[in-house]
Amino acid sequence: MTVRHVTRQALHILSFAVTLAVVVGLLKVLNWVPGALEPGLMARYPSIEAAASGLGIRQIYVPAYFPESLRWPPAGILAQSKPYQAVVMEFARAGDGQIVLVISQAASPNFEPDVAIRFDTISETIPLDLGGRKARLEAGACGDRSACSRIQWDEGKVRIVLTMKAPAVELVRIAQSMQH
Amino acid sequence: MDLTNLLNAYPGIHVVQAFLHSLSAAIIADRAIVAWNIRSPVIRQKFHLIAVFGPVFSYPLYQWINPDRGSMHFRLGTLFDSSRWFNLELWNVLPAGPLLVLVLGVATAIFLFQELIPILRHRPGPADPASRTVRASQGSPAASAAEGLDGEAPVLFIVEDDDPAIHSVTSRSPAIYLTTGLVRSLQPVELRAAIAHEVAHMRRSGRPLLTVAYVMRVLLFFSVATLVAFRKAAAEEEKICDDWAVKVTGRPDALAAVLEKLRHSDAYEIEDHEAGEGLRSIERISYDLMVRERIRRLADGRSTTADTGDWLKFAVTVASIAILNYYIV
């Protein structure tokens, strides 16, 4: 193997690496463009206040009752104002930092927050009266067989969904404390 | 169901991601051929086929590896998230979602009018149906030219037609069809080179790669990148057969002369179809460019039947595309 051969091989590798770098850069620019053209697309925010002020969302629904086992503030906040307003707050358990509660609100019934908590089976679906609002409570188990529950209702044009890795009774208490 | 819901449903996501993955794969594979200085058409063809095979399986495979790949968290950390474009209205007038559907529609129309319909209408034989076709007799110029090319002599048919043309049928009864015009216009050594090229097609027809690739290409009918990549792979197939013909005849100049004569043949005009004269002109120009490139590489002595030594580069390219496409949702 001559020096010339090694140099040529190195140039080929460099040339391919540059190709990949250009494609990655191009993709990043193309991913950035929509946000630049139309601010308000889904993004992460450091705080509830930052999301509200940054996107002009007048009301973000937060529970007044908050179990001690959960950490405050939210571990993650995702929000958008385009194509419709939506906020997703994820709360971690104090002990291990695992996401155990997700609260989402969206001005569209089609919004699916792809939450970190995934139901494996739903064993019960119960209609519920939540301070005069019609709510739907679902109870079942998550992938790791732990108890999971979900409750959803409409607050005007905003659909609120709470998903928790806990029995339904705790989730109902949190939901009741969100009534205005 | 509105467009956003359609694009967010499983088939919609599969189509969008296959489209994007084929685009990135085609660009990277194309540039990789240049960057790695790949010369063998056998290897070049495999590079082009990455954009034909990969996107069919990439989305279900990635979802199987990571079911959360479609989640908001994943999308926020990706290189490119297509959903950011769907609801965008460019200059508050032009919605980007329907634009994508338009691009997919154009690719589908090209597939229908340039590939599927012509194949369904295809007539066997290079000349018009009224032409007389006879089997080449022993000792005839064509039969003599084909002697000793590769084991058993190929079955040759002579078609009564003044236009110089040649093609092979590789189905149940493989045979080569030559026109009387071709036999008359070529020197014996050129005729041998032309037949050798067709014998190469017949030999390679036993390999299912291009047939399977065509099935994949049909599945990705909506992807412009796959269309282009498949055509480039098909062009490499011609070069592979050129190289085999040069190997057995030892006369690249003779094959180059054949291609030059066929370039000007009316029989190689693109068949009529309903897509209009403009499209036919583009096809003709594209065909002519391909033939000229083949003539050039034969004249430059670039023909090679080597197909080893570049597999590591191929593996690196496939791996790079697979990793990159994982982050394109």
Which residues does each predicted region cover?
Chain A
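N-terminal Lys/Arg-rich, disordered targeting/topogenic segments
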Residues: M1-V6
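Hydrophobic membrane-insertion alpha-helices, especially the h-region
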Residues: R8-N31
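Residues at structural and domain junctions
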Residues: H12, L37, G56, K157-M164
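Short, solvent-exposed recognition patches
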Residues: W32, L37-S149, D154-E155
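Surface-exposed amphipathic alpha-helical segments
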Residues: E155-H180
